Structures are given as structure tokens and as C-alpha cells.
């Protein structure tokens, strides 16, 4: 804290916040003089983790205590005091983590859920290494149409130079390891790449911080950064992709093998991911819009499939050297919560390592069952997957199911302009 204030002596305010189950920032602004007392703990209502996407508290039948809005102590997460995108010289931001009434990490906090799953890997002497990619559209709020530059077009940095330079500058200031900004094939669609790391929880923190930072910087330049999974019906959607491998205690990649001769560790992890994939979709696609991205269109997966160097598969084995062999998980939408996405991915890999043998592995890898195409179907499949429910936590799983069903009911009750346009 003292080191930060030495670098940013003009700091006046600090935004202290939690990330709710949807990855939304929930918090408040305090004076910098109150930062020292906040470091010892501050209080937020437990119901922060029972909110839907619109911020409404959704209470499950098993947890009416939420309605009492009890406060819980929240402590700063080490290494997350950063300059804010909102006037970085005078404003900072700090991530918090909640504890329950007994002082244990709060079970509904997505960050805690991911920590628990990662700990299971470490218990086995396995260390996941991940690298995220997140896509978004940069929409000119003044223009009538978006400009297409083409996939990997090198002129994009000059076209959007002020925005890109500012984003790179602020990402560096926030210690976000942004390694690339890539132009996608669609008009004004970009992909943000973050450096691979074995600090799995920290990587997911960085995804949320980068998503927020991108939105703020875009607004400064008259753009809107749109991370919806499917913002335009005729264009490709936005995905949140994770590249993942497993290291041993010595740091050696346990997936290392020739592309056409995947080793047993890789094949078991693939089989586990495929087996849990239909149930996982309730997490990967957190709203109705996310399922529109998974309808047959361009390079987005519609089957629980895998393949070498193909972007139409949900699980892709990218081109790489043997020592850099990895799996790319392509199912999640850009609006998904990265903590929950990664906790679900790792759960699938654990399932393969703990429950699948060589005989059933081949059958699973050959199968490619279709994924649920509607949210209510995905939630129903999720409810019938005890391994995934247990891994994410029964309390969290109940809250997620209840919250998503409430959101779905509200959405389905809306009369759209398309309906009224064709009314008799």
C-alpha cells in the first residue's frame, strides 16, 4: 500500500469492490485516507453474491437469510491495488474477498470456488497453466456502421491507434500482462490476449480487470466495447477462450507429445472435458444471448467435439511444438465469469483423471453429442451432474440455478418489437 502511494502520491480515492457471480463489479468509493482501515477489513452485504445480472437479489428457498442482508467482512486481495481507468492519477481500485460468519472464505464467491478446484490439482502434484483470449466489438457510437479491417489486418493499430495505445498504456499501469490485440474477421471485432501463467486465479482476476478497463477506455474515445456473446445476429459472436496445459512440480508440461499421438494425460483430460461439456454449458453461456452464439455459425462450436487445428471444435489442439502442447477450450462466451469458466474446465479435467479409464476414454473421444441449444435445457442438464455440482459447491450451484431460472422467466415475459410487428 505504501509502495503504491509512493508511485501515485496524488491518489484521492480508492474503488473497493467484489466480483459477483456474473463477474460484475460491486463496491464503493472511499477516500484514500480510509484505505488503511479498509486493509484490516470492511463490510459488504452477503447478498452481493445472490444478485442477478441487473443487481436484484435472488433468494433460494434454502437461504432466506439472504433477505436479512447480513454484512460480512471483506479483506483486500494481495496485489490488486491498481490505478483505476477512471483518472488513474487520482483514483485507485482494490479487489476484496468475502468471509462467512465463521471466518472461512465465502462459498458463493466465484474466486473462492476456483481456488478450491485449483487446490485439488495441487494436491495431486499438478499445476494448470492457462492463457485467456477474449473477444469484443468496438462500436463507434457516432457512426452509422462499423468498419471492417479483416482478420489479422496490420492497419488496425493505425486506424484505432489512440484507443489501442491508451489501452496498452493502462494495461501496463494495472500490471495486466496484455500480449496482443488482434483484429478479427468481423467489422471492428478484436481479440485481447493475456500471457500464460500458472497463477490461475490471478489470470482470471486479470480477465475481469481487462474487460472493465477496455470498456472504460472505449468510452473515453467515443466507442462502446461490447462483450456480449452474440451482439449481432449476422456476425460472429464473442468468445472467451482458454488455452490450458498441466505441469508437474518441476515445471514440465505433462501434455508434451506429438500432435497426432496425444499422450494418456492429454486424452484423459479431453475425455473428461467432453463428458461434462453438456452440463458445463450452464456456466459457459450465462444468459439467453450466449446461446445464440452457439447456433450453427462460422467457427463457433455446436457439438461437444475436439480436433486438431480446427476452430469449429469446442476443444482444439492448436499448432505448437511438442513441449508447448495444450488444449484450447472454445465454448465460453465473452460475457461469462472467468472464475467460473475456469473452475468448470478444471473440474472436467479432474473428472477425466479421476473417473475415466482407457476403455471408456476411446468411446468418449469418438462421440460428439450435440450441446443444449437453449438455456432451460442447459440448466436441466447441469442439475443432473452431481460431480460438477459438488465441485462448484452445492450452495453455489443452487444459487446459480435459481438465479438463472429467474432471469430466464423475466426474459421470456418480455414482448418484443418483432412480435408486435407481426401481430394480427
Language-model features: where?
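C-terminal accessory/tail domains of diverse enzymes
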Residues: 1-9, 17-24, 38, 202, ...
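Short acidic-glycine loop/turn motifs at beta-strand connectors
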Residues: 20-21, 140-142, 246-251, 320
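Short, hydrophobic beta-strand segments
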Residues: 94-100, 190-197, 244, 329
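Glycine-rich tight-turn/loop motif centered on a GG-T
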Residues: 149-157, 196-204, 251-260
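Core alpha/beta catalytic barrel or barrel-like domain that forms the active/cofactor pocket
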Residues: 128-140, 174-194, 225-246, 280-288
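ATP/Mg2+-dependent ligation/transfer catalytic cores
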Residues: 1-183, 202, 340, 367-424
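Accessory "access/gating" subregions that flank catalytic or transport cores
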Residues: 164-172, 178, 194-199, 211-225
